[in-house]
Amino acid sequence: MRIYNTLTQQKEAFKTLEPGKVRMYVCGMTVYDYCHLGHARVLVAFDVVTRYLRHRGYDVHYVRNITDIDDKILRRADENGEVYTDLTDRMIRAMHEDEAKLGVLSPNEEPRATAFIDDIIAMIQKLIAGGHAYAADNGDVYFAVESFPDYGKLSKKKLEDLVAGARVDVQEAKRSPADFALWKAAKPGEVSWQSPWGEGRPGWHIECSAMSTKCLGDTFDIHGGGPDLLFPHHENEIAQSECATGHTFVHTWMHAGAIRVNKEKMSKSLGNFFTIREILEKYPAEVVRYFLVSSHYRSQVDYSEDNLAEAGRTLTKLYHALRGIVPAKEADVAETDHDRRFAEVMDDDFNTAGAIAVLHAVANDINHYRREGDEEAAKRSAAVLVRLGAVLGLLQQNPEAFFQADTGSELTAEDIEAMIQARADARKAKDFAEADRIRDDLLEKGIILDDSREGTTWRRSQD
């Protein structure tokens, strides 16, 4: 297996620190608002990484943190006129609801920053003792960037350029413009904790260093996150952690690609900013997941109605292959060429686009066997399709449930069944004009009928 390491900017053979075990940390949400499409990309990307590593037999210990104290959180709580913990608790519940709909498995641990204040303070004390941090007169504590010669090794930024660029916003308490806060002195009315430097709260970067090393040890296998976190957040994590522990922080750094909307950067100012909730009001959750998985995790993804519609159509093809067939028992299905091809592409830096192509090849086999009347071969291939789909978090629904999923249609399942019965009654009475009218009315509302000798089934259009 080879994984692209942001640190070395190349694919590397993946070797775990401990045989058969993977320790992975991913930066999670700052819970001041609902999760957006960019968050969905990261959630799904590292869910697939976790699923595939487990599929390959690794014991994965996956930690994804929650930032539950931050400037943005305090500002939003103040705007809402609520206690900050009420805001964060509400947003955490919403996040869990969103990720469950997207089929994202829960991490092994989900540490919250506010539960690690003692660990954060202890790490800051280590940094001060080692000459890597200093307390300012105003109660802030800063990391001394120039004390870490390797600063910039992840982002490939030069310290002298960062210092020069930061001079426009020099704070008097800092010794160097590029230094960053480890501890922020309390402001009037803000939540704070007691520390050796007075009342205050932690900086964002030190939170992740303290949580990750506490949960996974001084050195662990994989650290991941969104593209916007590479610098300064992950760069600062490396500096803090390696100065505090004296050990290499992380072996493999992984970053998901950015999301664009209609080929433009997603931003609130452009009016193209979508929360997961807003998207799931328009599209089935599995279609959204399929859309995200269809591209390589490092690639830039363009969100558009056309692309989501295409994702819906192609996912529908896979479910069509499974419709009306009972997959063979897993124990009765040996490893196939498709399994081997799937492993080959996924071993190449989690190439989910290639894996999706394998799923469609299996679906083509199912359709071929059914045309040939070889139901047993079709059942075995269906088991392979469901098995491989599970690694991507796809194709685990009953096909009928997928086809009949309600995504905001004006018609409920009960309404549709009643209209199908009315159509059947009209056909029985040889009133074919009325039967056709009902069929056309349903089609206009996005409901497609499929007639067979066994009766009539229906599905919602994915267009």
Swiss-Prot record:
One cellular component term from this protein's GO annotations in UniProt: cytosol
Broad class of where this protein is predominantly found: cytoplasm
Chemical reaction(s) catalysed: tRNA(Cys) + L-cysteine + ATP = L-cysteinyl-tRNA(Cys) + AMP + diphosphate
GO molecular function: ATP binding; cysteine-tRNA ligase activity; zinc ion binding
Cofactor: Zn(2+)
Cofactor note: Binds 1 zinc ion per subunit.
Keyword Zinc: yes
Documented EC number(s): 6.1.1.16
Listed SUPFAM superfamilies: Anticodon-binding domain of a subclass of class I aminoacyl-tRNA synthetases (SSF47323), Nucleotidylyl transferase (SSF52374)
Assembly, per entry: Monomer.
Name of the protein in question: Cysteine--tRNA ligase
Native source organism of the sequence: Marinobacter nauticus (strain ATCC 700491 / DSM 11845 / VT8) (Marinobacter aquaeolei)
